Every structure is written in C-alpha cells, then in structure tokens.
C-alpha cells in the first residue's frame, strides 16, 4: 500500500466525526486534500467549512461546499488537518505548506482537533525528521534568523515562498524539541515572529493514522 492510499484511508475515517448541519474546520496539505475530496460526498449534510488556506478554500468550492471565513463563526465542532510530524502526546510540527498561522487560528476555534496522517509522520521527538517552519514578518527576517541560531537552530530562508498573510518562512534545522510547549512559547515571543510550526499549546485530540492494515484511531 502506498503513501497516498494510507492518506486516503485516514481521511475517509475522519468523516465519522462530521456532524450533520455543522460548519467544520479544515487545514491544508496533501492529506487534507484527500479529506476535502471525501467530504464532497457529505456536501448536502453540512452547512460548510472554514479553511486554513486559500488552496483549501478553492478545493472546497470545487466540491460544492460553502466556504465561511473565520470571522463568521464563533466556534467549530471539529478541525481536521494533517501534520509534518506528530509525537505520542499528539503534539505536532506543521507548516510544510506555509499555512501554519491560519491553521493555528482555525484550530483554536475548534472543540476537537482531528489530525490525519500516514505512518511516516509519527515520531518520538519533534524536529527529528522535519525542519521547523517559522513565519516571519519580512523586515525581521535576518534579526529572527540570528535569534534562531542563538537558540541552537540552523535557519534557512524558504526562497520564493510568500504566505497567504504576505510573510516569509524560515525553516529551522537541527532543533530536537524536547519541550514543545516551552519552545512554542519562546519562539512566539521573538519580535517579528508571527507564529512557529509547533502545535503543542493546542495539540490534537484524536489522531487517525492510515496504515497498511487500515485506519487506526488514537484518542
């Protein structure tokens, strides 16, 4: 079974958490694209969705699902998103698709965060296989990079990428993130940082892992 099939399996299993007449939150990325495609089968049963990226908004519209802005809702029953890494405590690194800030905004609206991944995304320590994305206001890029070096990281500017918010991304290598909550707070306090890709303060509530044996739910 290839990686795409495992992603589709996890995405399909997440449909069981979608309530009729609800507005749901969706993230962004390849696994979420599979979920949006599967969600199309329920378009007549839900009110619509709030998306964490312009790309996801376009895919939802293509499926005939009404798109709401985050400003139009006060809360969401569920938020469904993928991850670049996830640890046993359901904390994640996200932001490979540069949508991390909007993903945190929509996740914060949700009563339940459902993370859908394939087995390759499961790690014991965050930062062990994936660089940590940090969204930065452009004028602070060099200043923030120096601070990240001082903290022990090796930041690289993600060339040619501008976020949906008009900012830039620094990918930080060589961070073994032993205390994700404290690291998330510390990085977010650096002037010029919009947010970083550690999702520990708002971790997932449920993980659905697509495996060769089927979808595995971890609550």
Curated annotation (Swiss-Prot):
Q: Any signal peptide, and if so, which residues?
A: none
Cite the GO molecular-function annotations of the record: ribose-5-phosphate isomerase activity
Enzyme class, spelled out: isomerase
What residues bind substrate, as annotated? 28-31, 81-84, 94-97, 121
Pathway of action: Carbohydrate degradation; pentose phosphate pathway; D-ribose 5-phosphate from D-ribulose 5-phosphate (non-oxidative stage): step 1/1
Enzyme Commission (EC) number: 5.3.1.6
Instruction: Write out the GO cellular component annotations.
Output: cytosol
Q: Which UniProt keywords apply?
A: Isomerase
Show the SUPFAM superfamilies listed in the entry: D-ribose-5-phosphate isomerase (RpiA), lid domain, NagB/RpiA/CoA transferase-like
Catalytic residue positions: 103 (proton acceptor)
Catalytic activity, as annotated: aldehydo-D-ribose 5-phosphate = D-ribulose 5-phosphate
Q: Give the family from UniProt.
A: Belongs to the ribose 5-phosphate isomerase family.
Name the UniProt record assigns to this protein = Ribose-5-phosphate isomerase A
> What is the gene called?
rpiA
């Amino acid at each position: 079974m290839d990686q795409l099939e495992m992603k589709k399996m996890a995405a399909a299993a997440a449909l069981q958490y979608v309530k009729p007449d609800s507005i749901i939150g969706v993230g962004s990325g390849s696994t979420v694209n599979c979920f949006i495609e599967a969600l199309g089968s329920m378009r007549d049963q839900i009110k619509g969705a709030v998306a964490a990226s312009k790309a996801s908004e376009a895919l939802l519209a293509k499926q005939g699902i009404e798109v709401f802005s985050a400003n139009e809702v006060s809360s969401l029953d569920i938020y469904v998103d993928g991850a670049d890494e996830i640890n046993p405590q359901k904390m994640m690194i996200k932001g490979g698709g540069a949508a991390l800030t909007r993903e945190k905004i929509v996740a914060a609206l949700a009563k339940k965060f459902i993370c859908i991944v394939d087995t390759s995304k499961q790690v014991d320590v965050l930062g062990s296989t994936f660089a940590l994305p940090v969204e930065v206001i452009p004028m602070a890029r060099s200043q923030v990079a120096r601070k990240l070096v001082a903290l022990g990281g090796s930041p690289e500017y993600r060339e040619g990428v501008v976020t949906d918010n008009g900012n830039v991304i620094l990918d930080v290598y060589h961070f073994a993130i032993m205390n994700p909550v404290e690291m998330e707070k510390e990085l977010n306090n650096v002037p010029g940082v919009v947010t970083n890709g550690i999702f520990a303060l708002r971790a997932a509530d449920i993980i659905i892992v697509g495996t060769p044996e089927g979808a595995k739910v971890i609550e």
